[in-house]
Amino acid sequence: SRKGFVYDLKSFSLESSFEYGSEGWGITTMGDYLVMSDGTNKLYHIAPSTFNILREVEVYDNVGPINQLNELEYVGGLIWANVWLTDRIVAIDPKSGAVKYDLDLSGLLSAAERGKLDDKDDVLNGIAWNPVSKTFYLTGKRWPKLFEIKVEIPN
């Protein structure tokens, strides 16, 4: 709908709404601003008070652009994004757009569980960070399970 909403943090009552010019697939906070994906290979650094785009960063790995960036989390100085219609999560340098780590999560669901899903869009689609346990929660569209994983980053 290209429309955003501002809610009161305590009462959750709607305070205002605003329009913006792109699709919003995923969003995360990074310091004093937001980072949003729109299903392309771009990440948009956004001022939260105005929703104006401050900067665009193109995301790429050693093969080329990474399109269909979806849900985002900012953890450990990197932006973690699931790549829609795949079993991948990529960890992105927010300044350069370079993929630093690429997680293959194709083994999360068993063959039997996968067989009950629609191959077209019942895919990995949710990523959330738990700062207490330092783990990610992962799930997908119509998946029967929620997974908690710990990612060990090499020094």
Outline where the language-model segments fall.
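Conserved beta-strand positions in repeat-built beta-propeller and related beta-rich domains
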Residues: 1, 34-40, 81-85, 138-141
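Glycine/small-residue-rich loop that forms an oxyanion/phosphate-binding "nest" at active or ligand-binding sites
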Residues: 1-20
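WD40 beta-propeller blade core
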Residues: 5-7, 44, 90, 147
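Short loop/turn segments that connect beta-strands within beta-propeller blades
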Residues: 8-12, 47-51, 93-97, 150-154
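A short beta-strand motif characteristic of beta-propeller blades
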Residues: 12-18, 55-64, 101-103, 109-117
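Beta-rich, blade/repeat-based domains predominating
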Residues: 20-40, 63-75, 111-131
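Loop/turn-rich, solvent-exposed surfaces of beta-rich toroidal or solenoidal domains
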Residues: 65-98
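Blade-level signature of beta-propeller repeat domains, shared across WD40, Kelch, NHL, RCC1
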Residues: 128-155
